[in-house]
Amino acid sequence: MESNVNDEIEKAFAKDSELAKDIIKQYGKTKSIQPLVHRICKYINTLQKENESGQVKEAGSLKRKDRVQHELGQLVYGVLNLSFQAPMRKKLDVYIYENGIAVTLPGEPNLIEFWLPWNEIRCAIHVPCPRKANVQNNFVIILKSESSAENIVSSDNVKEPVFFTAPYPLKKLNLVEGLRSFTHCTNSWDIFRDYFEFIGTSTLSPSVEEFVCPNPQTGDNGTTYGVEANYKAKDGHLFFLRTGILWGFRKPILFIELASIQHFSYSNVLQRTFTVNFEAGGTIYSFDMVDQSVFRAVNDYATKHGLMDSSLAEEKAAPVPKNPSVSYLNEASSLENVDDMDDIDVKEPLFSDNDEDVENSDSEDGSESIGSEDEE
């Protein structure tokens, strides 16, 4: 019996013989841990058998060989060693098949981490990767959802977006050719967009016709599209696209379709920054610390797409600072236009004894003190 136990432990921890010896030693000394050791060994050995047999990790009873032959179709092309941030943070390989996208472990084309059929992909978004010394492309794949609020996509949702980064130049990509070659491509976005559009999957990317940020950034490849903006105290970037607005790239990644936006407004308007608010699906999404230099570009985009809502804008607008001198000038102007002073009903004197104190106090309060913006 003891020999069988030792074999079971050694098999489960074959890659670390010293650990196996320590577990065997403790197993003999402590009876209370013996049932737990059996369960752990059984679990590890079962996983090893599944990997050896090539069983698919996700739900389903098909083995990999059957899946490759009957579900994926033929290989169109592959892009290896890409940096994924969602739904997991790791380096993975991407294989584009006739029937969908297979994301696999590096160097293991048959070890599929997750599978994205074409009919479950809603759209693919490409934006430049901001604040990078080397130019890179960010890719966000939006999945279809049965939710009634599918026009508002967040990585907090059950079907969170798939997000990965690829080098911009073609020469830095590790490519695998299949049914299609890359002779007509100039960068990593060309490769993905080419086939996405071929099969009818919607694609989105920034354009100078839609929105350009006036503040140059590192890694923008000549034209800046991303606007620095905080969401729930997390720093990130807003991208104003043809059919929606993307915020990333901290979790949650957000994509709000223009068609779902009920109200749009500005708030917290200060000397250097302001806040942009979008109400969609009954929720207000506020993006803070937007630089005043991009106000005109944001306002032009909102106007172009009919997002302006005067009622909400007035409700959420920053209050006008009190200024007694303005009030006085208005009253003085009205007095100049009156011929007969007897017609004026003056209920209170224009000045009080402490007006000078009030004016000085308001002057001090009126000067905004802008603190330094903390970087996360």
From Swiss-Prot:
Pfam families in the cross-refs: Rttp106-like_middle
Region ranges (Disordered): 334-376
Function field: Has a role in meiosis.
Family (UniProt): Belongs to the RTT106 family.
Cited InterPro entries: PH-like_dom_sf (IPR011993), RTT106/SPT16-like_middle_dom (IPR013719), RTT106/SSRP1_HistChap/FACT (IPR050454)
Record-linked SMART domains: Rtt106 (SM01287)
Domain of life the protein comes from: Eukaryota
Protein's name according to its UniProt entry: Meiotically up-regulated gene 183 protein
Keywords noted in UniProt: Meiosis
Cellular compartments per GO CC: chromatin; nucleus
Keyword Cell membrane: no
Gene giving rise to this polypeptide: mug183
GO biological process: DNA repair-dependent chromatin remodeling; meiotic cell cycle; transcription elongation-coupled chromatin remodeling
Gene Ontology MF terms: H3-H4 histone complex chaperone activity; histone binding; nucleosome binding
Bias (Acidic residues): 353-376
